[in-house]
Amino acid sequence: SETPFFYKDMKDFANRIVYYESSRGCPFRCGYCLSSIDKRVRLRDLALVKEELQFFLDQKVPQVKFIDRTFNCNHQHAMEIWSYIQEHDNGITNFHFEISADLLNGEELALLAKMRPGLVQLEIGVQSTNLQTLEAVRRHTNLDKLRHAVVRIHSEYNIHVHLDLIAGLPYEDMGSFIRSFNDVYSMRPQQLQLGFLKVLKGSYLEEMA
């Protein structure tokens, strides 16, 4: 809440993507990510978040891209924000969130199903479907729940879905990467984003290298 609001004068940001953070930190321990070093999650005050989102809505910003590491790691926080943008939709602004799909529960999926087409887009990090790889990088994903959530979201035809993969993770050879790619492609995302592993200084993977 003490972090100042950067976007008071929108002249310099006209027709641009606005980056916004409603939380810092991540409760998970993915070995390639520096956010895993500090597992605390600090949430911005919701009243302040709503005030700032309303400013973006009033300004008719084309897209607000949330840079929270795992937006839906706190159910109440996510529901409050998703409910607010659904109730105050201006018919123009799109909101982008990075989420863990296997954390989505029935209440969240039902709310997402009510969104105007184009109001929300979701970026979902799968990274790999190789269980040995996921264990090696300390990424605990329920792949069955993830797939079920993506299928449920697709069934409403209202949300643009990005699915992410990382090439170069431990125990991922060409054969297993092809399987991961095919697994993710079969979920029929609107966009499949491929990143390449960067061993970041201070990360768990650097320690293990």
Q: Which sequence ranges carry the predicted segments?
A:
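Conserved acidic functional residues
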Residues: R69, D164, G195
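Catalytic cores of alpha/beta
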Residues: E108-L112, P170-S186
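Radical SAM [4Fe-4S] cluster-binding motif and immediate context
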Residues: E2-S155
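Short, hinge-like loop/turn segments at secondary-structure boundaries
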Residues: W82-S83, S180, A209
